[in-house]
Amino acid sequence: MGQARPQRRKAVIVEDDADLRWLTAALLEESELDIIECESAEAALATMLICGKDVTMIFADIRLPGVMDGVDLACEVRMRWPHLTMIVTSGNPGDRLQHLPPGVLYMPKPWQPLNILMVAERARLGQSLSALNATT
């Protein structure tokens, strides 16, 4: 009997702009993470309830359609899955950043692809983002 292959960790991308979601997914496919795409915070939360134990990172836009935005999602994720790497992004976050829970990384748009890949690699390896928070 062969050994079971270890299940790859997952990253969830939450972005309502289909082109930007596709671009982010294509970029993160360079990491060793499987990608799950969602267009709303509600869809991401539903996904997390199903496969949250396999997810190591969520990358979410702040401004999303629906009842929840990316900050609301970050608060829910931080409460339910505190170990998870959570990144939010926006070109215009307004006053929503003041409501981010501790440990959530904010990356302003336009972000640098290399920064996303560095965060993904740290998440995949289970490393802290504290050093990145100081520089991003």
Model-derived segments and spans:
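Acidic, metal-coordinating helix/loop segments flanking the phosphotransfer/catalytic sites
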Residues: 37-57, 97
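Acidic catalytic/metal-coordinating carboxylates
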Residues: 40, 68-73
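Two-component/phosphorelay signaling modules centered on CheY-like receiver
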Residues: 18-37
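Active-site residues of response regulator receiver
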Residues: 61-62
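Two-component signal transduction core modules
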Residues: 58, 106-107
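Non-catalytic signal-transmission and effector/linker regions of two-component phosphorelay proteins
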Residues: 1-12, 18, 25, 49, ...
